[in-house]
Amino acid sequence: MRAVLTVVGKDKTGIIAKISAFLAERNVNILDISQTILSEYFTMIMLVDLSAAKTELSNLSEECLEMGKNIGMSIHVQHEEIFNAMHSV
């Protein structure tokens, strides 16, 4: 199963490193990543593969919300199909 992880917040050093390490600990594979800095704001979208993950999507989503609070970012995870349905015209 694939999911989309989005991250938004004030830019600071180590955001990608922290999130990548967090995902690696749970055996979540990063398939694609796009990130940009808009003025002083960091934005990132990751496409991740959960087929070998050590956690379920619902647990990962809750853990990412908590991690986001800890690092001052908004982090959300959605099933890829739900993300696509919500963002199609």
Region roles according to the model:
Residues 1-89:
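A conserved regulatory-domain signal marking ACT and ACT-like small-molecule sensing domains
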